[in-house]
Amino acid sequence: MEEKYLILSIESSCDETSLALFENNKLIAHKISSSASAQAFHGGVVPELASRYHEHNINRLFVDILNETKIDPLTITHVAYTAMPGLPGCLHVGKVFAKQLASLINAELVPINHLHAHVFSASIDQELVFPFLGLVVSGGESCLYLVSDYDQIKILNQTQDDAIGECYDKVARILGWNYPGGPIIDKNYQEDLATLEFIKSQPAAKNFSFSGLKTAVINYVHNSKQKKLDFDPIVIASSFQKFAINEVIKKVKYYLDLYQLKRLAIGGGVSANSLLRKKIRDLNVISYIPQMIYTGDNAAMIGAYAYALIKNHKKSILIK
């Protein structure tokens, strides 16, 4: 008979405060509170503001989960939390809460690598089969991994400058659109209007790099304004998205072929992008794609990954 675990998981790496409760691999409660609307006023994430929102929300979300599930907190066996990477102040709030709670209820503490949890975000409601290629595309990172086991995750490629999600936000901002920029650009995407070529494509084996694309788009808009030339934001946004997503897909194909892999898992905020999801599904591989609610930062992916580690007597690798 399988041992019963009751796992509380905590995510606080950036601007989402999230808690989830798992009974083994079954998600029984999940709460997310985002400070994105407050951050939008500043055009991006302000770390101190995000930390304060975590402090304000984390206790409330825990109480909400207790009220919703009617569980006795003393029955919680494990407290999993995002240990890295992320904004230091935000991580600190989650870590302190997790440590204090675990100490009070005598639960085991489980630190989790946030990026690796993104790799396994699709495992919340489906089984992932090893080995597979893992793609994480978010506001903080763009990474590709060779995943052979829950604790055998080899980095193959990662961003050498700006992450793809950050570039989405910056491009949206220069076009006068709100934060976060990714959903807005994706919503306005029109393939037949993606006619601009800002920069040349890079070789697939090179590290992810989006700063050149971001700078080229910003310069294009600035130059157009200075010369009082008309420009269409939809054309610019569509051209940006088409190039950025094609760069990701090119690298995915390269590493699938290089390692002769037939499975691909994706995660991170940009994995919600409709063009990326379509192109992933068009690949001749088995694709593990998370539900939309699990693409951004969330405690469900932390808890699902924590359970897999606990069950298999493994620990999260606390390096990128």
Curated annotation (Swiss-Prot):
One of its GO terms (biological process) is tRNA threonylcarbamoyladenosine modification. InterPro entries: ATPase_NBD, Gcp-like_dom, KAE1/TsaD, TsaD. Pfam families: TsaD. GO terms for cellular component: cytoplasm. It is an enzyme of class 2 (transferase). Gene3D superfamilies: 3.30.420.40. Substrate binds at V136, V137, S138, G139, G140, D169, G182, D186, N273. Keywords: Acyltransferase, Cytoplasm, Iron, Metal-binding, Transferase, tRNA processing. GO terms for molecular function: iron ion binding; N(6)-L-threonylcarbamoyladenine synthase activity. It catalyses: L-threonylcarbamoyladenylate + adenosine(37) in tRNA = N(6)-L-threonylcarbamoyladenosine(37) in tRNA + AMP + H(+). Its main location: cytoplasm. Its cofactor is Fe(2+). Binds 1 Fe(2+) ion per subunit. PANTHER family: TRNA N6-ADENOSINE THREONYLCARBAMOYLTRANSFERASE, TRNA N6-ADENOSINE THREONYLCARBAMOYLTRANSFERASE, MITOCHONDRIAL. Required for the formation of a threonylcarbamoyl group on adenosine at position 37 (t(6)A37) in tRNAs that read codons beginning with adenine. Is involved in the transfer of the threonylcarbamoyl moiety of threonylcarbamoyl-AMP (TC-AMP) to the N6 group of A37, together with TsaE and TsaB. TsaD likely plays a direct catalytic role in this reaction. HAMAP family: TsaD. This is tRNA N6-adenosine threonylcarbamoyltransferase. It comes from Ureaplasma urealyticum serovar 10 (strain ATCC 33699 / Western). The lineage of its organism: Bacteria, Bacillati, Mycoplasmatota, Mycoplasmoidales, Mycoplasmoidaceae.
